[in-house]
Amino acid sequence: MAKHLFTSESVSEGHPDKIADQISDAVLDAILEQDSHARVACETYVKTGMVMVGGEITTSAWVDIEEITRKTIRDIGYTNSDMGFDADSCAILNTIGKQSPDINQGVDRTSPEEQGAGDQGLMFGYACNETEVLMPAPITYSHRLVQRQAQVRKSGELNWLRPDAKSQVTFAYENGKPVGIDAVVLSTQHSEDISQKDLIEAVMETIIKPVLPAELITSATKFFINPTGRFVIGGPMGDCGLTGRKIIVDTYGGMARHGGGAFSGKDPSKVDRSAAYAARYVAKNIVAAGLADKCELQVSYAIGIAEPTSISVETFGTSKLEESRLIELIREHFDLRPYGLIKMLDLERPIYLPTAAYGHFGREEFPWERTDKAEALRAAAGL
């Protein structure tokens, strides 16, 4: 019986890199509300008392970058200078320019269907049947822990919690299937007035136990709650934050390969984002159709060219079909040209801020999580 361990991590919305991601996507959403065809590449840097928002944006819209930034920080929970970061008093620098006309001429076309990719690159999508949302178990439960941390912090149930937090979950696998949780790490920022003993007890009872299924916990499961013993200094005061620095947290927790491109702050003409969403959509429908237990799809593009330069699929020996037949089905049922995938998933809408914390995948509210192609794929496969 083959046994192994696999670990994934997540971070909360108050982590410095996630603050940056959320500001970038809040700016994107505000622009898309007014101009659905805008070209946006918005990058954010945060540090104690300061936010710098930059990038290249071409749009007919006007948005108040400063107010969007302050509201995003406020909604996360940084509302007091005692935390080292305050939405109402931090300095905000705006260094946004326009997208290069050299890129525009490659993307924009007289015929919308021939819209070129906004850049070259390779993207991966993945799905597996380990969880009900067809995501790997380690990243799924890592996200749920920090989501629960934010929930009890914002509700006031644990009013000594602060916005910054990190989680990590190690699963034990037998023959490729998750069978239990080997280790859990949860570090959460807190106020000065809570003892380590009380913190550990409250985090275990209020955050960990309600999230992790009891049947996956054993007497051998190890728990590490604030293992340094103190986490008062956090957020941008503890570390600087930058858009696009949590790409594994954003995707599959390391279980699948990654093409290297980040998501937040990018409009859907950027295939780094939109094609990664489409690849997840394809992989999830293949698994939902029962054509494979695991599916990893790679798609690649050349700047200014509509058709993907390659499509490849890996099912790790779990497919009921030849992988060449899977690729035929993908080409028949999914339009992976930039224009096609934008229309297929209705991406020219202000839907991106919620993606910027707790993972872009495995959350049913997003259009790329639909399994509406599964039945047609199954029928076409003759299963």
Curated annotation (Swiss-Prot):
Residues 99-109 are annotated as: Flexible loop. K(+) binds at residue 43. It comes from the Bacteria. Mg(2+) binds at residue 17. Keywords: ATP-binding, Cytoplasm, Magnesium, Metal-binding, Nucleotide-binding, One-carbon metabolism, Potassium, Transferase. It is found in: Cytoplasm. It is an enzyme of class 2 (transferase). It catalyses: L-methionine + ATP + H2O = S-adenosyl-L-methionine + phosphate + diphosphate. Pathway: Amino-acid biosynthesis; S-adenosyl-L-methionine biosynthesis; S-adenosyl-L-methionine from L-methionine: step 1/1. Binds 2 divalent ions per subunit. L-methionine binds at residues 56, 99, 239, 270. GO terms for biological process: one-carbon metabolic process; S-adenosylmethionine biosynthetic process. GO terms for cellular component: cytoplasm. It holds the Pfam family S-AdoMet_synt_N. Its EC number is 2.5.1.6. Its cofactor is Mg(2+); K(+). GO terms for molecular function: ATP binding; magnesium ion binding; methionine adenosyltransferase activity. ATP binds at residues 15, 164-166, 230-231, 239, 245-246, 262, 266. The keyword Cytoplasm applies. Its main location: cytoplasm. Belongs to the AdoMet synthase family. Catalyzes the formation of S-adenosylmethionine (AdoMet) from methionine and ATP. The overall synthetic reaction is composed of two sequential steps, AdoMet formation and the subsequent tripolyphosphate hydrolysis which occurs prior to release of AdoMet from the enzyme. Homotetramer; dimer of dimers. This is S-adenosylmethionine synthase. It comes from Pseudoalteromonas translucida (strain TAC 125). The lineage of its organism: Bacteria, Pseudomonadati, Pseudomonadota, Gammaproteobacteria, Alteromonadales. The gene is metK.
